[in-house]
Swiss-Prot record:
Entry similarity comment: Belongs to the ketol-acid reductoisomerase family.
Protein known as: Ketol-acid reductoisomerase (NADP(+))
Pfam families: KARI_C, KARI_N
Binding annotation for Mg(2+) 1: D195, E199
Organism encoding this protein: Tropheryma whipplei (strain TW08/27)
Recorded GO MF terms: ketol-acid reductoisomerase activity; magnesium ion binding; NADP binding
Active-site positions on this chain: H112
GO biological process, any: isoleucine biosynthetic process
Keyword Nucleus (UniProt): no
Boundaries of every KARI C-terminal knotted domain copy: 187-332
Length: 333
């Protein structure tokens, strides 16, 4: 259990002027970078973008009206640096562009704790280290902000050198619209470990494998691939929407009695206790740093394993069937 508790912080808990009174350098203009930069600017925050000279995102940021500098120039100019490039790239960007341009009293912000948790980045003393992590992809963060809503977030303080890091984190969260929905305090360790576990065991790895096995089981038994696709993949969104809206209980309330009964008697046989034991092993690899080491080692050597695994996944028959069906039906257009 977390020692922090489960208080939800909202807009009334934050002073927006704190982030409005500093210059923010957003390093990176990808999914989170573009969304957070645009939301901050629309909240009255002064923002510059830090991108390499040959970055494919440079024109997009300039077209959005931002001043675009080299990462080292942006870091030197700003008082808060939001490092929002992908995890594997953060070490090099930090070492080459940020590390020597941090001044005492500056703040370094992340939206995922990976590099701090596993020690790939160690900021100097005298610098605030904080995290604001929206619980949704960048396009959702931007869309919800424009619709006068917000994407929930978690935030964390790793190093409070200034004595105001907590308030600064809430101010930043308010600036990107997260406090409209609410934010929960966590730690870099908790955010990193639970985020990686959720991705690997449930949301991405576990779910994708479950879908593929379900599809293969039906097709191997002689059913049409198109029908199998509908039953194990397409209808998933309908169930997920219900779960997000009202938890597992709303999903059970909304489905037929046949489906509900079947879920009780068959679900635990598909996802049995061995699955939970495997989940515990995966969590152990995350907590020990074994996964991080494997991932970074592969990235540093050219991402050969990652590329091979991606190619294998792309060749699964469900991909071709899905692409063909989505091209035929109006719901995908």
């Amino acid at each position: 259990m977390s020692e922090i508790g489960t208080r939800v912080y909202t807009e009334c808990d934050a002073d927006l002027s704190l982030i409005q009174n500093v210059l923010v350098a957003v390093i990176g203009y990808g999914s989170q970078g573009h969304a957070q930069a645009l939301n901050l600017r629309d909240s009255g925050v002064n923002v510059v973008i830090g991108l390499k000279e040959n970055s494919a995102s440079r024109k997009s940021a300039q077209d959005s009206g931002f001043e675009v500098l080299l990462p080292q120039e942006a870091a030197k100019k700003a008082q808060l640096i939001a490092l929002l490039v992908p995890d594997p790239a953060q070490r090099d960007v930090y070492e080459s562009a940020i590390k020597h341009n941090l001044s005492e009293g500056d703040a370094l912000l992340f939206s995922h704790g990976f590099n701090i948790r596993y020690g790939y980045i160690t900021p100097p003393d005298g610098v605030d280290v904080l995290m604001v992590a929206p619980k949704g992809p960048g396009h959702m963060v931007r869309r919800e902000y424009l619709d006068n809503r917000g994407t929930p977030a978690v935030f964390a303080i790793e190093k409070d050198a200034s004595g105001r890091c907590f308030d600064l984190a809430l101010s930043y969260a308010k600036g990107i619209g997260a406090l409209r929905a609410g934010a929960i305090q966590t730690t870099f360790t908790e955010e990193t470990e639970t985020d990686l576990f959720g991705e690997q065991a449930v949301l991405c790895g576990g779910l994708e494998q479950l879908i593929q096995y379900g599809y293969e089981t039906l097709v191997e038994a002689g059913y049409q691939p198109e029908v199998a696709y509908f039953e194990v993949l397409h209808e998933l969104k309908l169930i997920i929407d219900l779960i997000v809206e009202g938890g597992l209980s709303k999903s059970r309330w909304s489905i037929s009695d046949t489906a509900e009964y079947g879920s009780y008697v068959s679900g635990p046989r598909v996802i049995d206790k061995h699955v939970k034991e495997n989940m515990k092993k995966i969590l152990g690899e995350i907590r020990s740093g074994e996964f991080a080491n494997r991932f970074i080692k592969d990235q540093d050597s050219g991402a050969n394993e990652f590329t091979q695994l991606r190619e294998i996944a792309a060749r699964h028959p469900i991909e071709e069937v899905g692409a063909r069906l989505r091209a035929l039906f109006s719901w995908s257009k």
